[in-house]
Amino acid sequence: MQLFHLCLIISCTCPTVQASKLCLGWLWGMDIDPYKEFGATVELLSFLPSDFFPSVRDLLDTASALYREALESPEHCSPHHTALRQAILCWGELMTLATWVGNNLEDPASRDLVVNYVNTNMGLKIRQLLWFRISYLTFGRETVLEYLVSFGVWIRTPPAYRPPNAPILSTLPETTVVRRRDRGRSPRRRTPSPRRRRSQSPRRRRSQSRESQC
C-alpha cells in the first residue's frame, strides 16, 4: 500500500495523476463519506460482505444497460445519475493509473502488489459505490435504505435467533406494497362518514337555496 501511494504522489508523472488524486481522495482514507448525502453511511454499507457485490465489469454492464441514455445525456437527470457518472469515470482513471504504474515498475513483485491492492481495496469500494447508485436508481431511496438496515440487523443477530436466509433487495418492494395496502385499510373503515356528509350536503344546499330565496 505504501509503495502504491509513493508511486502516485512522488514518482508518477502521468497526466492522469491530478485527476486521479481528486477523484480518489476518499479512497485514500480521507474523511469523506459519499453516502451521507443520500441517507446512508459507509458503516451501513460495510455490513454487506465483499462477495455480495458483483464485479465492476458486471456493474458497469448493468449501468449501461439500464441508464446508458441518461448517463450519456448532457442534461442533469438526478444527483444519483451524476454520482454514477463520476464513479464510472473514477474507475476508468484508476485503471489507467494502475496500468501506468504497473508498466513502469520493473520489479514483478511490486507490480503484483499494485494490482492486488487496486483490486482488493479500491476495487471493493468502487463496487460498493456502483452497487449503491444503481440500486438507488432501480429500487428507490426508501427500499435501499430499508434493505441496508434489515441486512445489518440480520447479520448482527446470532444465527440461532435469525432466519436462515438474508433479506433480498428485489423482494422488499413487494413487502412495501403490502404494508401500504395494510395502511390503506383504515380509510375503508371510515367510509360511513363520507356517506353521511354526502347525505347532509343536499340539506345544506336546500337551506342555502331557501336563504337565497328569502
UniProtKB/Swiss-Prot annotation:
Q: Where do the segments described as 3 X 8 AA repeats of S-P-R-R-R-R-S-Q lie?
A: 186-208
User: Propeptide residue ranges?
Assistant: 186-214
Q: Which domain of life is it from?
A: Viruses
Instruction: Give the record's GO CC terms.
Output: extracellular region; host cell; host cell cytoplasm; host cell nucleus; T=4 icosahedral viral capsid
Molecular functions (GO terms): DNA binding; RNA binding; structural molecule activity
Please report which protein family the annotation says this sequence is part of. Belongs to the orthohepadnavirus precore antigen family.
**Per its database record, what is this protein's job?**
May regulate immune response to the intracellular capsid in acting as a T-cell tolerogen, by having an immunoregulatory effect which prevents destruction of infected cells by cytotoxic T-cells. This immune regulation may predispose to chronicity during perinatal infections and prevent severe liver injury during adult infections.
Protein name listed in UniProt: External core antigen
Underlying gene: C
